[in-house]
Every structure is written in structure tokens, then in C-alpha cells.
Amino acid sequence: MKDRLPELKQRTKETELSKDKDVPTTEAEEQGVFLQQAVIYEREPVAERHLHEIQKLQESINNLTDNVQKFGQQQKSLVASMRRFSLLKKESSIAKEIKIQAEHINRGLDDLVKEVKKSEDESGPSSVVTRILKFQHAAMFRHFQQTMFTYNDTIAAKQEKCRTFIFRQLEVAGKELPEEEVNDMLHQGKWEVFNESLLTEISITKAQLSEIEQRHKELVNLENQIKDLRDLFIQISLLVEEQGESVNSIEMIVNGTKEYVNTTKEKFGLAVKYKKRNPCKILCCWCCPCCG
């Protein structure tokens, strides 16, 4: 059998020489990769700053959600008592706090959108920082949107309860008024229908009248709250339309990542097969005495 060990040594030397010749190119390529990684590491403080702001914004949304839940718990039952001034005052303070928090969160989400666009211009839409900001904005905006919808439903339910209470009081007093007429009084505040002549005409007491007027004040207060939040809901609806494209983009990126991972697995499998078929290993086998 022919001894091919000298041939193996010769090929090994040629391989080493070819590696020495390719060193500048390889180092340049590696330097390019390391430079890119270095840029990411240098930008880590920027990412941490964004994450710190995101955490503060998320805490604000959680506090808003808690206040909305407290407001909703208070509206589950209407207290048919004349001593409701303190309760109304407390509800009004919570509503004002919710409004301030919602406006603050809305400004924070707007600033985050600006940061996303800035990151896209500087690093591209597929950079790590950009994708993190997009995902965090989408998640927090969805949470904020659900909270505000819950608050709106709570206010609408309370309006309906107050309206039902007023109709019931009028029925008990024996005064039947058309629903449209009562609604006009509620919207316009024309309570001259409940004057002294009405008190003498029907058997309604001043206590009942005061309770009805109290409910009317609640309705007026609720309508003012809805008017204050109208602009905010319009901005939310516009952001929903913008978020649709962002969510679709994120979904496409995730699907692309899955395809890339599958392709990488296939390439690793081929690499294992090519490694098993390495010609150097075949030459080594021919040199072994056991194969003689």
C-alpha cells in the first residue's frame, strides 16, 4: 500500500500558507463584526434610559388602572341617602386625578412614538433598540386603551343609573313626564318644572326634590368629565390606526425571524454532514494500519 503521509503533510502546509495569506481579509471582516457589536454596547446606556422611562410610564398606567377600578367599585351601588356631598367630592377628586394621569400617559406615549421614529432614522427599523421600543409602546398603548374604555363604560353606566333613579322618583311622586322631556331637563338644566307650583300639584317632598337635583348634579358632572376626555379618546383612536401598521410590521419581523431560525438549523445540519465527509479525515483513515 502506498504511503500517503508525505502528501498529507504537504497539503497541511499549503493550507497553513493559504490561511496566512487570507489573514488581512479575515481580520478586516472580523473587525467589521466587532465594530458593529461595539456600537451596540456603546448604545446600551441609551437603551437603559429608554427602559427606565418605559418602566415609569408602565407604573403610571398601572396606577391609572387602579384608580379606574376604585372609581368603578364606588359606582356599583347608588346610595339613596341625602348625605352624599362627601361621596360626590371624593368621586370628583378621583375623576380629576384620572384625567390628569390619562393626559400625562398620553403625552408619554406620544414621546415614545417620537423616540421610535428617531431610532428608526438612526439605527434602522430592524435594530434591537427600535424593536424593543416598538414592542413596549404597543403593549403599553393596548393596556392604556383598555383602561380608558373601562373608565368610559363606568361613566356611561353611572349616567344610566342616575337617569333611572330620577324617573323612579318622579313615578313615586305621581308625576308622569315623557322621557324626552326629562332628558331635555337633564341636558339643559331646566328644573323650573320642580318649583313650588309642582310641589303643591303633586305629593313630592322637598327631600325628594333635593335628591333629584343631587342626581342631576351628578349627571352634569359626569357629562363634563366625558367632554374633558373626548379629545383624549380622539387621539387614542388615531393612535389605534397607526398601531395597526406597527403590529403588522412586528408580526412580519417575528415570522421572518422564525424562517431565519429554520434556515439556520438546516445550514447547521448540512455543516455537520460536510464535516463528516471531510477529505482530510479520509486521508487519515488511509494512513492508518488498520485499513491495510
From Swiss-Prot:
Chain segments carrying region Disordered: 1-28
Pfam families: Syntaxin
Domain t-SNARE coiled-coil homology positions: 209-271
Molecular function in Gene Ontology: SNAP receptor activity; SNARE binding
Keywords, ordered alphabetically: Cell membrane, Coiled coil, Cytoplasm, Membrane, Transport
Biased composition (Basic and acidic residues): 1-24
Gene3D superfamilies, alphabetized: 1.20.5.110, 1.20.58.70
Cytoplasm found in the keyword field: yes
UniProt entry tagged with the keyword Transferase: no
Membrane topology: Peripheral membrane protein
Entry's family note: Belongs to the syntaxin family.
Function of the protein: Plays a role in endosomal trafficking of the epidermal growth factor receptor (EGFR).
Protein's name according to its UniProt entry: Syntaxin-19
Species assigned in the record: Bos taurus
